[in-house]
């Protein structure tokens, strides 16, 4: 029984599904998808639970959410192993994900008060007040690269605001989704407040098509995000928050410390085996001898990166990709770039047939036309050389995406110029692209999202504002508008 609907674990009535470790092939999880009727059942449960949950005080809802944080802490080792085994990422990285989940609780509570709390301004004859109300029933679609942390970034602020939720994890990480749901169950969420439906495309389409849905919060690919946007078009009454990845540029201008710059680039491009929406996909490198030396060092260090299993000792920097198919897609993308005229500096290699262990790849595309503006979700870095900083900015902006942009340079003036001209929601200076703060908004423009940033701003799309003018008594104004006469003679 792998679905959690209205406070009960039930068996899915859809297709059967098996999840294996992407490196060892070990069977980790077996279950069945939710069919359309069970998705509707989850929605009815969430709708029925909404009035009571929304009427609780923030303090009462916060108690449950903080209890969940405590359970994350006490079950950290177990959840770390589940995430690592299911995604293929190393144990150390899965542990940082669980830590991020724990930290998200306090940050979300603070963000609720700052972004969507209550305000009151006194007036001579009363007060002006601002409150925020929950939308109602929200669907949350989770991705596979951070199956705990990223859905958590939607679920926690949505629950704090008073919404009820139907959560569909990625079909590639059902075990992690179930493990997190069981902790919410232990935290004491009332039946129907948070419901779990497992499944792939058919389950997702049934969920997003629900008429009685008040909103949908999504993290995933641009293709799926665009499909959801089209599906919900003409329904302005539903809140839609999309985070859809990027084709992110990292500009390496002047480099004082080559080793430090190489380290930053590897952290930006290859951490999580390149499976972060924030990963650098395009390296824009200044022409000249210094750039040549940097590139040679980058290739040499990257060549020594050997992916390993989640529990290997010593721990590897990267593990496997989410699946063998995902790894093969990266290899295919590299082969296509090479066929277009790209010059391979480091060829990505599948280390073992039947696994997702893929070494990083680096390919130079300077002077090659018609390169697809697509996000290759894996450890493949494309390199372009430039002559002037203005040219670098034009190249950085030459994408339909707009999530992340980074600059390595000792010159503050160039960063200031980039801040003015970059078309990206997050712009970093001498910091990895894969570094972002939960105390700041997270999101992009263009094909990277629909102007609903998450993290610190997630509270904004989890509630709507209600403004009020208030007075505890009603009296006739001392001064009336022209044409109004309330004299005793007229009244009688």
Swiss-Prot record:
Give the GO molecular function terms.
succinylglutamate-semialdehyde dehydrogenase activity
Q: InterPro entries in the record, alphabetically?
A: Ald_DH/histidinol_DH, Ald_DH_C, Ald_DH_CS_CYS, Ald_DH_CS_GLU, Ald_DH_N, Aldehyde_DH_dom, SuccinylGlu_semiald_DH_AstD
Enzyme class, broadest EC rank? oxidoreductase
The record lists the catalysed reaction(s) as:
N-succinyl-L-glutamate 5-semialdehyde + NAD(+) + H2O = N-succinyl-L-glutamate + NADH + 2 H(+)
Enzyme Commission code: 1.2.1.71
Pathway info: Amino-acid degradation; L-arginine degradation via AST pathway; L-glutamate and succinate from L-arginine: step 4/5
Family of the protein in this entry? Belongs to the aldehyde dehydrogenase family. AstD subfamily.
Protein name, entry field: N-succinylglutamate 5-semialdehyde dehydrogenase
Q: Which organism is it from?
A: Shigella flexneri serotype 5b (strain 8401)
Originating gene: astD
